[in-house]
UniProtKB/Swiss-Prot annotation:
S-adenosyl-L-homocysteine binds at residues 76, 81, 97, 122-123, 141, 278-279, 305, 327, 353-354, 370. Pfam families: Methyltransf_25, Methyltransf_31. The keyword Nucleotide-binding does not apply. This is Phosphoethanolamine N-methyltransferase. Involved in phosphocholine biosynthesis. Catalyzes the N-methylation of phosphoethanolamine, phosphomonomethylethanolamine and phosphodimethylethanolamine, the three methylation steps required to convert phosphoethanolamine to phosphocholine (PC). Gene3D superfamilies: Vaccinia Virus protein VP39 (3.40.50.150). InterPro entries: Methyltranfer_dom, Methyltransf_25, Phosphoethanolamine_N-MeTrfase, SAM-dependent_MTases_sf. The keyword Electron transport does not apply. Keywords: Methyltransferase, Transferase. Its EC number is 2.1.1.103.
Length: 505
């Protein structure tokens, strides 16, 4: 490197360092100002903090994996809202915060726990030393939003190393916009899109001394329900990750996010189905099917395979119900959360696998699922779960891809295999719901309606070809036209069917 290039590199490096120092100083000033009153209200920056805390703290703790007897590192521990709770069952808790008065207050409240220790330290400091592979759970609540993008990326690299294989990282952040009502002269907080955090943590990995590679696997990402319930606010989002060996299989979620429901694909589907929708007929079929549910204000609805949230917003806004939307695709839920901004409706979203997720018995009034269960191999087990989760008198409504009785053609069999679908004929599908315990089961073949919807959607895409090409390109246009024509052909031939199913508990 010549002298001028070396000098330029040094200037650039100094500029980066100066920017990082400026960031740390701004954050420190901000928290020194907001830590004068060492109260829950000051820490949560909200006048309703005491009431919110009663619901929010148990909810956050309920999302954590078992940490009984384990080592817990709490970053940005504050005055200890969570420190004492963690110390009750953990083997050891190290609580850390970069404001000395705050961590001292935490110690004065929680110092009687002999398994807790307290440290005043900045998580971004290179002087902070934590042994690799020594921690079972890293916990933070409102920390990363006070770090720059570069600081978040660096911290993730370090956290993956600190964590044991099989250990977990849980964090919760304010995304998109401010939540608390405290007045702030200056606000250096970074209100990011959730997908920033998802991307940075997905890219986090470590290689140990033996050359074994490990990475982070997303277990869940969801809104904090207490904020949805009390503030109609979906911007409080938490994530739970697990450190796994890089060879461990997570193929289905990867298939959904990298193949079938990659970001460009979702935007294409939304263009075809209408804003907020990625399933057959968009708002039109949603209105028709939701009307069959006789929803009442205050009821609770579970949407399995919620996609990007259009049906959930429709139900919440038009029927005043509380909707929980779950989807295995991280990309889908990211879009749903973005669509929720400013809507002020009671809808919460979560990245979750409906085959492993559990809810208490008798939780929901309605379980709703649109063109999703075709991905599920063990439908009888899922329907038994639906039956348990529903309140007595509750309803399930499902639309789904089906097939005609008999052996499928080679082409249709190849399509089913490529997509990983599990398809049944309409009658068998209805029988599975009956076998799970549902009464008054309606199992309707709606293939004629499916064909009309497909024809209308295809005609609309072809009519607006120039706009579509400008926004997406020829390859995406060809994929949609080819895909819709193939569905029309399979359905016209009677092989692919579309079913509507309703059952009552």
């Amino acid at each position: 490197m010549d002298a001028s290039a070396a000098a330029a590199a040094e200037i650039a490096a100094n500029g980066v360092l100066a920017k990082l120092e400026e960031e740390r100083e701004a954050q420190k000033r901000y928290w020194e100002e907001h830590s004068r009153d060492l109260t829950v209200e000051a820490m949560m920056l909200d006048s309703r903090a005491a009431d919110l805390d009663k619901e929010e703290r148990p909810e956050i703790l309920s999302l954590l994996p078992s940490y009984e007897g384990k080592s817990v590192l709490e970053l940005g521990a504050g005055i200890g809202r969570f420190t004492g709770e963690l110390a009750k069952t953990a083997g050891h808790v190290l609580a850390m915060d970069f404001i000395e008065s705050v961590i001292k207050k935490n110690e004065s409240i929680n110092g009687h726990y002999k398994n807790a220790s307290f440290m005043c330290a900045d998580v971004t400091s290179p002087d902070l030393v934590i042994e690799d592979n020594s921690i079972d759970l890293i916990f933070s609540n409102w920390l990363l939003m006070y770090l720059s993008d570069a600081e978040v990326e660096k911290l993730v690299e370090r956290m993956v190393k600190w964590l044991k294989v099989g250990g977990h990282i849980f964090f919760r952040e304010s995304c998109f916009h401010q939540s608390g009502d405290s007045k702030r002269k200056v606000n250096p907080t970074h209100y990011r899109e959730p997908r920033f955090y998802t991307k940075v943590f997905k890219e986090g990995h470590a290689i140990d001394q033996s050359g074994n590679s490990s990475e982070l696997s997303l277990l869940t990402c969801k809104c904090v329900g207490a904020y949805v319930k009390n503030k109609k606010n979906q911007n409080q989002i938490c994530w739970l990750w697990q450190k796994v060996n890089s060879t461990e299989d997570r193929d289905f979620q990867r298939f959904l996010d990298n193949v079938q429901y990659k970001i460009s694909g979702i935007l294409c589907y939304e263009r075809v189905f209408g804003q907020g929708f990625v399933s057959t007929g968009g708002i039109e079929t949603t209105k028709e099917f939701v009307d069959l549910l006789d929803l009442k204000p205050g009821q609770k609805v579970l949407d399995v395979g919620c996609g990007i949230g259009g049906g959930d917003f429709y139900m919440a806004e038009n029927y005043d119900v509380h909707v929980v939307g779950i989807d295995l695709s991280i990309n889908m839920v990211s879009f749903a959360l973005e669509h929720a901004i400013g809507r002020k409706c009671a809808v919460e979203f979560e990245v979750a696998d409906c085959t492993t997720k559990t809810y208490p018995d008798n939780t929901f009034d309605v379980i709703y699922s649109r063109d999703t269960i075709l991905h599920i191999q063990d439908k009888p087990a899922l329907f038994r779960s639906f039956f348990k989760w529903l309140k007595p008198g509750g309803k399930v409504l499902i639309s789904d891809y089906c097939r005609s009785p008999g052996k499928p053609s080679e082409e249709f069999a190849a399509y089913i295999k490529q997509r990983g679908y599990d398809l049944h004929n309409v009658e068998t599908y209805g029988q599975m719901l009956q076998n799970a315990g549902f009464h008054d089961v309606v199992a309707e073949d709606r293939t004629d309606q499916f064909l009309k919807v497909l024809q209308r959607e295809l005609a609309e895409v072809e009519k607006n070809k120039d706009e579509f090409l400008a926004d997406f390109g020829q390859e995406d246009y060809d994929d949609i036209v080819t895909g819709w024509n193939a569905k029309l052909q399979r359905s016209s031939a009677g092989e692919q069917r579309w079913g509507l199913f309703i059952g009552t508990k």
